[in-house]
Amino acid sequence: MSSELLDALTILEKEKGISKEIIIEAIEAALISAYKRNFNQAQNVRVDLNRETGSIRVFARKDVVDEVYDQRLEISIEEAQGIHPEYMVGDVVEIEVTPKDFGRIAAQTAKQVVTQRVREAERGVIYSEFIDREEDIMTGIVQRLDNKFIYVSLGKIEALLPVNEQMPNESYKPHDRIKVYITKVEKTTKGPQIYVSRTHPGLLKRLFEIEVPEIYDGTVELKSVAREAGDRSKISVRTDDPDVDPVGSCVGPKGQRVQAIVNELKGEKIDIVNWSSDPVEFVANALSPSKVLDVIVNEEEKATTVIVPDYQLSLAIGKRGQNARLAAKLTGWKIDIKSETDARELGIYPRELEEDDEPLFTEPETAESDE
């Protein structure tokens, strides 16, 4: 061992931020194990790596006793005082026991420790970088596929895209560039493990934040997202700025903003509606593109009964109940849809308005992607 090791550790500390002292302490600990494994397993030893020269020495540590029972661990008071007259019973004497051929073992051990610590440090850097990217999107390149995952390169690391996080309307092949949403970053013994998604509602949210400057700067707030990936989604938006149309901001000039997101999601339809703190208005908006005649609210059950024109019933419910299902997810309210005819037969429509009540509904403002 020589000063070359110390020079190498100094470079590592500067370039990779790995503490030189921590590596030296790790080397010393590893050399203790190496000494015991190769020379004397039972002996209590200390290894000293000289911080200036790089030389390594091994010291046996022995307790000073009146009567010796184990020469590997103990030394008599007489022998100890022969080394130094001030030693007393209970003290610890260190005697150098560095083997002649220990240099080869030390060099090999040091190399292994440094390699391991560098690998751990690099994994730590990657983990720190990606843990801050949770709930964010990145562009990756498909590397390979199997029956469980698509393996996506994110540059420094390969992420896993599970089957249940893949969009049903997409097919993937190596070298495809795709945007993915980072759902989880885990520490494992083999390094950071990153899981990504193409179906998570957060992907849609982040795409709007990227495409719509008013959302990015906070002028428009994206309040909620409901998504059935690859088929249809709904988002609700609001603003405190009376001069800004939140729905129009998301649609963009000639529909360019929302169309860019639809293209990224391979044709997924997107409804954009105005959010409201009033559940009557919000639920009516959320059922877009259907026209709504009335919304009856049950606050205790957090449930609503929605009356729509007979000819709009199928549109309000949607194919396989999708429109109603997405509206319920978007608003957080249960939604039971009834036709005008059924509502009249049940006696729940029309309701009598109080003197101060305004007309129940005008057409809700909404936007739907063209795809």
From Swiss-Prot:
GO terms for biological process: DNA-templated transcription termination; transcription antitermination. Residues 347-371 are annotated as: Disordered. Residues 135-199 form the S1 motif domain. Residues 301-367 form the KH domain. Residues 353-371 have a biased composition (Acidic residues). It is found in: Cytoplasm. Keywords: Cytoplasm, RNA-binding, Transcription, Transcription antitermination, Transcription regulation, Transcription termination. SMART domains: KH (SM00322), S1 (SM00316). Pfam families: KH_5 (PF13184), NusA_N (PF08529), S1 (PF00575). GO terms for cellular component: cytosol. Belongs to the NusA family. Participates in both transcription termination and antitermination. This is Transcription termination/antitermination protein NusA. It comes from Bacillus subtilis (strain 168). The lineage of its organism: Bacteria, Bacillati, Bacillota, Bacilli, Bacillales.
